[in-house]
Regions:
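Flavin (FAD/FMN)-binding glycine-rich loop and adjacent Rossmann-like elements that form
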Residues: 4-143
Length: 143
């Protein structure tokens, strides 16, 4: 028996919604918590093929995609982040989803230690901790 993987699920409406334009333009964000270079991997609606795959430049995923607009005390990562169908097809892959999860866990720990909301985590300190833990957030992080 073959179990097909699920490429997409429900998404939050976040403080920011990542879009196709963010992927193809190589968007960079002040609140970046992950980076990717995976192409948009979209099957055609009739499931008879793939949409054209074009290698994008390196792009970043902003922390705001992990923060639901109307729910306090919650961060999300992986396929349920705030992203369009097209953008999700690029950021749903394991390395990027795992890095988003690491960022969410790190931010949650920082918020708990400081007694603040996850919305109020200082981005520079979150990025500093992620880099200390080996997360590459952009070209400046490459050796």
């Amino acid at each position: 028996m073959c179990i097909r993987d699920r490429r997409e699920t429900s998404h939050i409406v976040g403080a920011y919604t990542m879009t196709q334009e963010d992927i193809v333009s190589g968007a960079h964000f002040e609140d970046a918590i992950a980076q990717g270079a995976y192409y948009m991997d979209i099957h055609t609606p009739d499931n008879k093929g793939l949409a054209p795959m074009i290698q994008p430049p390196t792009y970043q995923i902003p922390y705001r995609c992990l923060i639901p607009q109307q729910v306090e005390g919650l961060l999300v990562a992986g396929r349920c982040v705030s992203a369009t169908h097209e953008a999700l097809s690029a950021i749903r892959v394991i390395p990027i989803a795992g890095t988003m999860g690491q960022a969410a866990g790190t931010a949650a720990a920082m918020a708990a230690r400081q007694g603040i909301s996850v919305r109020d985590v200082e981005i520079a300190k979150l990025q500093e901790q992620l880099r200390a833990d080996g997360v590459m957030l952009g070209e400046d992080d490459r050796a």
